[in-house]
Amino acid sequence: MLLFAQPATRIVRLTIDDITRAADGQVFIRFGEPPTPVPEPFATLLLQATTQRDNLQTATNPGARWLFPGRRAGQPLHASHLSQLVRDLGVPALAGRTAALRQLVLQAPAPVVAQALGFTHGTTTRVASEAGTPWSRYASGDHSRWPQPE
């Protein structure tokens, strides 16, 4: 939630198929296209989460593909339950997500962050503007349309 500024509703919809490992060992998570690289130590924790999932011992979920399976058949963990678990750890989820998104748009152009993490361009551009990003003059859009120098 905090590392990639994702809401709990999007996190609980992740499946184990959204977590991949490249031949070189780099771990990726798919929120948008292309998949986003996950830095250590979070990559190791994420891989552990794919193999040590809760609620798989119930009769309703033995083959669940959800990264966070819920107790109901075919359903992921409820987003409010995940949010409560995070709050119980002392982490204010909304404030943390906002801070994470601000940090991300300070490191990369807002349209790049939007595409990689599944946000709208408007959301990341607004957050970038509020954060005083150095990328505020970045020309978003499809740059492949422009003629290439010869």
Task: Locate each region found by the language model.
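Short, structured motif recognition centered on aromatic/hydrophobic residues
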Residues: M1-L3, T9-I11, F28, L46-A49, ...
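Alpha-helical DNA-recognition elements
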Residues: D17, Q107, F119, E130
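Short, basic (Lys/Arg/His-rich) helix/loop patches that form interaction surfaces
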Residues: F4, T58-N61, A79-A116, T133-W135, ...
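Basic, alpha-helical nucleic-acid-contacting "clamp/cap" segments
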Residues: R21-A73
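Short, charged phosphate-coordinating catalytic segments
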Residues: M1-D24, Q115, H121
